[in-house]
From Swiss-Prot:
Function: Enables the recognition and targeting of unfolded and aggregated proteins to the ClpC protease or to other proteins involved in proteolysis.
Highest taxon, organism lineage: Bacteria
GO terms for MF: protein-macromolecule adaptor activity
Pfam families: MecA
Family named by the database record: Belongs to the MecA family.
Subunit structure comment from the entry: Homodimer.
InterPro entries: MecA_C_sf, Neg-reg_MecA
Domain notes: The N-terminal domain probably binds unfolded/aggregated proteins; the C-terminal domain interacts with ClpC.
HAMAP family: MecA
Protein's name according to its UniProt entry: Adapter protein MecA
């Protein structure tokens, strides 16, 4: 494993496949958020010699970029713990009003105030995204073809979505179903190792015959969409009669 300081608040950890195997992990574990992956990230942080700037950090954000033979993990520390002063929360409702709130209403009110007082935390996340974009925009020498490729398709209704899944006659590693802005989005992960170089383009052309290609990213769906089926969405929907 290797650690690279991207900025004061962002580092990149490169994890090789053999490192994953030693920790009982595999690429598929990172396709959907789960407690197992979060525990793995913090285990890695304990094992590595972290920069001093991260030793006193509070909240951390993780973003994963799969590569053919490794995993790049971008870690950004939150600045909210350094800049949030509870005296700044004086504009919370008074005690009488708080006493009338349900626990959920109180937590939402507190969360809103903390969010408004912690703009630096947003800056930290944006810095992570910028660092990732700059890092992945520079191709490595002798870089091999990616083993996995993601397709994201958009559907206006469930009927068209289900009809599409019944046309899928090629291997799919995993798939997810999201709903956002009254549209359905299907993410499909395909293993293209050992396939001809034109195989990804052929797949996309076949998909476009029954579905709408989109520039919407999986990160956007994860942040703003509703995850309806966590894994094997294609296989589950193929069983539905319409």
């Amino acid at each position: 494993m290797e650690v690279k300081q991207i900025s004061e608040s962002t580092i990149k950890i490169t994890i090789k496949l053999e490192d994953l195997e030693e920790h009982g992990m595999e690429m598929a574990d990172f396709l959907v958020p789960q407690e197992k992956t979060e525990e793995f990230f913090y285990t890695i942080l304990d094992e590595l010699e972290m920069p001093e700037s991260f030793l006193d950090s509070g909240m951390l954000s993780f973003r994963v970029t799969p590569k053919p033979d490794k995993l790049d993990v971008f870690v950004t520390k939150s600045k909210v713990d350094k800049n949030l002063n509870f005296e700044d929360l004086a504009d919370l409702p008074d005690m009488d009003e708080l006493s009338q709130m349900t626990p959920d209403e109180f937590l939402k009110t507190l969360e809103k105030n903390i969010f408004e007082k912690s703009r630096d935390d947003i800056d930290a996340v944006q810095m992570l995204e910028k660092a990732e974009e700059e890092d992945t925009s520079e191709p490595e020498e002798g870089q091999e073809q990616d083993r996995y490729i993601y397709y994201i398709l958009r559907f206006s209704d469930l009927k068209n979505l289900i009809a599409f899944t019944k046309t899928v006659d090629y291997p799919v590693d995993t798939s997810e179903l999201y709903k956002m802005d009254q549209r359905y989005y299907l993410t499909i992960l395909v293993d293209i190792e050992g396939r001809p170089s034109r195989y990804p383009a052929w797949l996309l052309a076949a998909m476009r015959e029954h579905a709408e290609d989109t520039d919407t990213t999986r990160a956007l769906l994860q942040e703003h969409g509703h995850l309806l089926i966590v894994t094997d969405a294609v296989q589950h929907l193929q069983k539905v009669n319409c």
